[in-house]
Design a protein with these regions (language model features):
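Active-site helix of classical SDR
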Residues: 143, 179
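The beta1-alpha1 cofactor-binding region of Rossmann-like NAD(H)/NADP(H)-dependent oxidoreductases
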Residues: 83-93, 125
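Residue(s) in the substrate-gating loop at a strand-loop-helix junction
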Residues: 163
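Substrate-binding pocket helix/loop in short-chain dehydrogenase/reductase
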Residues: 119-120, 124-129
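Canonical Rossmann dinucleotide-binding motif of NAD(H)/NADP(H)-dependent dehydrogenases/reductases
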Residues: 22-58
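SDR active-site lid
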Residues: 194-259
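Conserved NAD(P)H cofactor-binding loop of Rossmann-fold oxidoreductase domains
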Residues: 111-116
Length: 345
C-alpha cells in the first residue's frame, strides 16, 4: 500500500515543481536576455556559447584566452572579453565595459574552472590559491558584479557549474574538490538570499549543475570505471541539458548522468560502505593517470614510478621481517611484530 502512496506523493511534488517553474520567475527570452559565460573559450563553456548563439541570444564570454577568428573554439557572434576571472579588479572593470557596450547581463553562467591533479603536499601555495580563485572566488566576483543589475530589472538567472566531485572528492583533487563543494554551498545560500524559490519576488532564479566527468582536456587520462554506469559526458550534450533547463525556467539542481543523483547519498551511509563504494568505483585511485592541465607530466610519471618502487621495496622489507620473526617465534625466542596498515602509504 505504501508503494502507490509514495508514487503519488512523488508525482504530485514533481507536478508542483513544474507548475512553479512555469508560473514564478522568468523564462529565457533570447530577444531580451544577455548571457555571460565565464571560461567560455573551450570545453563546456564553448558549447554553451554555441548553443545560446544558435538560439539567437546575445552572448558574452569572459576568458583569459580569447580564440582567434576561424579557429575551432571561435564561435561567430560571441562577444569575447579577455578577462582573468581570478582577478577581482579585472572582473569588475570588464563588467562595467559589458554594461556600457552590450547591455545588462540577465543570465550569468559561472563555468570557469581549472585543476592541478596533485597530492596536497605537492601543490604549491600559488597553485592552491589559483584553483580556489578561478573555480570558486570568481563566482563571488561575477555575482557581485552582475546581480545588482538583475535585481534592478527584476530579471535574472544565475547558473553555477559545479561537479559531482563537490560531493565526493578523490585523492589528488583536494583544491578542486574543495572549490566545487564551495560552489554548491554558494548556490544554496544565494538561492535563499534571493527569496523562497517558489514565490520569488526578486525575479532572479538560480540553477546548479553537477555533471560527472566531461570529455574535455581538463581530466585527460583519467579513466572512467564504467562506460555504461559512469560514461564520460559530451560537453555538447551537457550544454543542451542546460539550455533545456533555462528554456523552461527550471531552478534547483541538475545532476548528470544518473549516478550523479546517487553520489550525495554516499556521504550519509556508514563509512565501511562508503569505502567499499570508493574502492569498487575506482574513484580513490582515478587521478593517478591524470595528464590534463599539467606541464610536469614527465616529472609526475617519474614520481609515480618512484612511489611505486618505494612501496614495493617496503613491502618486501616487511615480508622479510615477518618471515624472520615467524622463524624466531617457532623457536620461541621472539614475539611477532605488529604491522599497521598505516605503515604503508
Amino acid at each position: 500500500m505504501t508503494g502507490p502512496i509514495f508514487s503519488l506523493a512523488y508525482r504530485l511534488n514533481k507536478l508542483y515543481l513544474d507548475i512553479s517553474d512555469l508560473t514564478f520567475g522568468i523564462l529565457f527570452d533570447p530577444q531580451r536576455d544577455i548571457v555571460l559565460i565565464t571560461g567560455g573559450s573551450s570545453g563546456l563553456g564553448k558549447e554553451l556559447a554555441s548553443k545560446f548563439i544558435s538560439k539567437k541570444a546575445r552572448v558574452v564570454v569572459f576568458d583569459i584566452t580569447v580564440p582567434e577568428e576561424g579557429t575551432d573554439n571561435f564561435v561567430e557572434g560571441v562577444v569575447y572579453v579577455k578577462c582573468d576571472v581570478s582577478n577581482r579588479e579585472q572582473v569588475l572593470e570588464q563588467a562595467e565595459y559589458v554594461r556600457n557596450t552590450v547591455g545588462t547581463v540577465t543570465m550569468l553562467i559561472n563555468n570557469a574552472g581549472i585543476t592541478m591533479g596533485k597530492k596536497l603536499l605537492d601543490l604549491s601555495f600559488d597553485e592552491i590559491e589559483k584553483t580556489l580563485q578561478v573555480n570558486l572566488l570568481s563566482s563571488f566576483y561575477t555575482i557581485k558584479a552582475f546581480l545588482p543589475d538583475m535585481l534592478a530589472v527584476h530579471r535574472g538567472y544565475i547558473i553555477t557549474i559545479a561537479s559531482t566531485l563537490g560531493y565526493l572528492s578523490p585523492a589528488r583533487l583536494s583544491a578542486y574538490g574543495a572549490s566545487k563543494s564551495g560552489l554548491i554551498a554558494l548556490h544554496e545560500s544565494l538561492t535563499y538570499e534571493l527569496g523562497p524559490p517558489a514565490f520569488n519576488i526578486s525575479g532572479v532564479k538560480t540553477l546548479l549543475l553537477c555533471p560527472g566527468q566531461l570529455k574535455t582536456n581538463m581530466f585527460q587520462g583519467v579513466p572512467t570505471p564504467s562506460t555504461i554506469l559512469a560514461p564520460e559526458l559530451e560537453p555538447k550534450d551537457v550544454a543542451r541539458e542546460v539550455y533545456k533547463a533555462v528554456k523552461y525556467g527550471k531552478r534547483g539542481e541538475i545532476k548528470i548522468p544518473l549516478y550523479g543523483n546517487i553520489i550525495p547519498l554516499i556521504r550519509s551511509i556508514p563509512w565501511p560502505m562508503a569505502e567499499a563504494f570508493r574502492y569498487l568505483s575506482g574513484i580513490a585511485q582515478s587521478m593517478k593517470k591524470f595528464v590534463g592541465n599539467t606541464v610536469e607530466l614527465g616529472q609526475r610519471s617519474a614520481s609515480s614510478l618512484s612511489d611505486a618502487a618505494s612501496i614495493i621495496s617496503e613491502l618486501v622489507s616487511k615480508a622479510g621481517d615477518v618471515a624472520d620473526s615467524v622463524a624466531n617465534a617457532v623457536s620461541g625466542s621472539v614475539q611477532l611484530p605488529k604491522i599497521s596498515t598505516g605503515d604503508i602509504n
